[in-house]
Amino acid sequence: MLSPKRTKFRKQHRGRMKGKSCRGNRICFGRYALQALEPTWITARQIEAGRRAITRYARRGGKIWVRIFPDKPVTLRPTETRMGSGKGSPEYWVAVVKPGRILYEMGGVSETVARAAISIAASKMPIRSQFIRLEI
């Protein structure tokens, strides 16, 4: 599972996801990509599930790039705990994704293989997304 090696602070505010993605919204490495169409938090487990799905489908051919990284800690309080006494402890990590952000990129395979592999990964994501290809 992806998570930062070390962070400056253990806990973070939740924040707001407004507007479109201004960075990471163009294909940089591969020829095909999965692009987010909605704002959300994507957990490290969901990122890993999508990566595994693409890798399994593509087998040996091709290369995969994961373009998002879970760098935001999400805290949870223990169940049946009374309110107060501070913020809960960090439980898992999420990547903040805005519309337009590239989630995965793929190269070295045919478009049919890439489309099928990326659609499997898209079904594992909690948002609507689209398959895009590099226009040369």
Curated annotation (Swiss-Prot):
Pfam families named in the record: Ribosomal_L16
Single GO cellular component term: chloroplast
Swiss-Prot/TrEMBL keywords: Chloroplast, Plastid, Ribonucleoprotein, Ribosomal protein
Cross-referenced InterPro entries: Ribosomal_uL16 (IPR047873), Ribosomal_uL16_bact-type (IPR000114), Ribosomal_uL16_CS (IPR020798), Ribosomal_uL16_dom (IPR016180), Ribosomal_uL16_sf (IPR036920)
PROSITE patterns: RIBOSOMAL_L16_1 (PS00586), RIBOSOMAL_L16_2 (PS00701)
The UniProt record lists the keyword Chloroplast: yes
GO terms, biological process: mitochondrial translation
Keyword Chloroplast: yes
Cellular compartments annotated: Plastid, Chloroplast
Region named Disordered: 1-20
HAMAP family per UniProt: Ribosomal_uL16 (MF_01342)
Entry protein name: Large ribosomal subunit protein uL16c
Organism this protein belongs to: Brachypodium distachyon (Purple false brome)
Taxonomic path: Eukaryota, Viridiplantae, Streptophyta, Embryophyta, Tracheophyta
UniProt gene name: rpl16
